[in-house]
A protein has these predicted regions:
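N-terminal signal peptide c-region/cleavage motif recognized by signal peptidases
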Residues: 19-21
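Short coil-to-beta strand junction motifs in C2/discoidin
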Residues: 41-45
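Short amphipathic, basic-aromatic surface patches that mediate peripheral association
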Residues: 28-39
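Structured domain cores in non-transmembrane regions
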Residues: 52-115
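Bacterial N-terminal signal peptides that target proteins for export
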Residues: 1-13
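Glycine-rich, aromatic-bearing surface loops/beta-hairpins
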Residues: 107-109, 113-161
Length: 161
């Protein structure tokens, strides 16, 4: 499980969560992403959050360990460029065609139903780039509901306990 905190939250609840961590409530959120059966090497994926204005809020996971390919995760790379801690403890192996990536992160309850969005960018070596490949509103009604992806992503969803 990846512990995840967001230093850029603008809500009063989030500020309280940062100032009074003993009172902060969080829950594990599991993001499941099924890749399409494409021809090619393993996919690099960036799973990250944006706020209600579409600004980068934090990285949940990056699949793929060769940093030279991160620039092909174009939206994530552009949005997260100023975050020098974006990769601390959140990287793993690339994901093969037709395979599934499951990421679990502890997210503050203040993020749920507050306009945040889970975004997933994907890139495959020697294939064309496009992003974002999937967007999930971080809302209670969206939990458990699959969303169709684009290009390399067949579908994705997030689940709450």
């Amino acid at each position: 499980m990846t512990a995840f905190t967001l230093p850029r939250l603008g809500t009063i609840a989030a500020a309280c969560a940062l100032l009074l961590p003993g009172l902060a409530q969080s829950r594990p959120v599991t993001i499941t992403t099924q890749l399409k059966n494409y021809n090619g090497d393993g996919a690099y994926l960036a799973v990250y959050l944006t706020n209600a204005q579409g600004a980068y809020a934090g990285t949940l996971w990056v699949a793929g360990s060769k940093a030279k390919y991160y620039k092909h995760l174009s939206a994530w790379s552009r949005l997260s460029a100023a975050d020098n801690q974006r990769l601390l403890g959140v990287t793993g192996a690339s994901v093969g065609a037709g395979r599934t990536l499951k990421v679990t992160a502890d997210l503050a309850d203040a993020l749920l139903d507050a306009g945040y969005e889970i975004r997933i960018d994907a890139a495959v070596e020697d294939h064309r780039d496009s992003a974002p490949h999937a967007r999930l509103p971080l809302t209670t009604p969206q939990a458990g509901q699959p969303v169709r992806g684009k290009q390399y992503i067949h579908s994705t969803r997030f689940d709450l306990p």
